[in-house]
Amino acid sequence: MKTHIHCGFHKTASTYLQRVLRDNAKRLSCYLTIINRIELSTYDLRMACLAYNSGRGKASAVRAELDRLAQRVAGSDRPVLITDEAFFGPHIGQDGETRLFPRAHEVSQMMVEAFAPHPVEILLYTRDESS
């Protein structure tokens, strides 16, 4: 089972992608297991990541939520796609944040460890800030 984790940067069509996935969930279900923010399936992990990235939460809370998700999809014979744009923390300007994903490396490592020994691909969409 390969796990794909989508962490889109703001204004990169993350919500659009999540809506398309939701609207086509039945058709995709034979090919892909989808854990989608738009269905609130990532809420607890999202909140743990936001708290950790802002310094108000602990890494252990993020690990616990990742472990719950990993258990949920354990044994899946299909690839897994987990999508939520807040896994790497608030965007610049949100909650007074002035840094761009300062703990992304740490959260990425926790993601890889949670789904081990299966491969994890982290998809981080970015955009040209000058536009």
Residue ranges of model-derived segments:
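PAPS-dependent sulfotransferase catalytic domain
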Residues: 87-131
